[in-house]
Amino acid sequence: MNIDYRKILEERLKKGIKNNEFVIYLQPKFYTNTGKLAGAEALIRWNRDGKLVMPNIFIPLFEKYELITVLDTYVLENICRLQQQWRKQEYNIVPISVNESRLHLYNENHINDLIDLVNKYNVQPNTIELEMTETTVVHNVELAKEAEKNVHKLGFIVSMDDFGTGYSSFSMLKNINIDVLKMDKSFFDDVLESRRGKIIIEAVIEMSHKLNIKVVAEGIETKEQVEYLKNIKCDMIQGYYFERPIKVEEFEEKYMKHY
């Protein structure tokens, strides 16, 4: 008997969206030199049958069966709706970064979808940061360049996520015009003990600044890491040292109401 796994997964995805099982979490980013709120990254969890399923479990499945664009759009629309609410409550809007999968970024309807969402929720594009990964770019550099140019024309911020985890990081900086570079956690795990690691980190930050690219250090967990990043003028920090990913309501209470 042939089992149509894609059909089953698609039905679960639709049901999950209808029942609000997919929950948005926000992890704040902070300016390194001041410690003030700089923005946040939108992350998603699946509250399935009372259990919280992490994205590393379900995202690969949605990608495998080419259903990820539905989830991408769901997250992006939720962030646009959230920013609309913040504006009505007269909160100061901070940029929220949203991951863009390869299938979504290269979809022929991608730009029209972005325009529709911006118009529907009256969102300023420069408060939305669209993240692409090295894998996305490597798959098709020309399509990635075209997508980057198109979203920039609309006014969105473009960032490179998980920088340093692939094999062509520096080549991508040459080909893709990004605004923000997110250095992967692996750079900083042993940074205080690794002279070679420090040289590489400092070179990446210096090079990025010369290209007018801001740098976010991801996965920061200790005070010593923070002090080091201050000294080398990294722009922003994200990690458990400051805050874990939290629900939207908690983010608003802790950061937006007093921002």
Where are these regions (language model features)?
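Nucleotide second-messenger and two-component phosphorelay signaling modules
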Residues: 15-19, 31, 49, 85-92, ...
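Inter-domain helical "communication" segments and dimerization helices
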Residues: 1-23, 67-70, 80-81, 88-89, ...
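EAL-family c-di-GMP phosphodiesterase catalytic domain
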Residues: 1-5, 32-33, 49-51, 101-108, ...
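Alpha-helical scaffolding segments of alpha/beta enzyme cores, especially the outer helices
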Residues: 81, 112-116, 143-153, 199-206
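Structural preference for long, well-ordered alpha-helical segments in enzyme cores
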Residues: 9, 42, 61-62, 75-83, ...
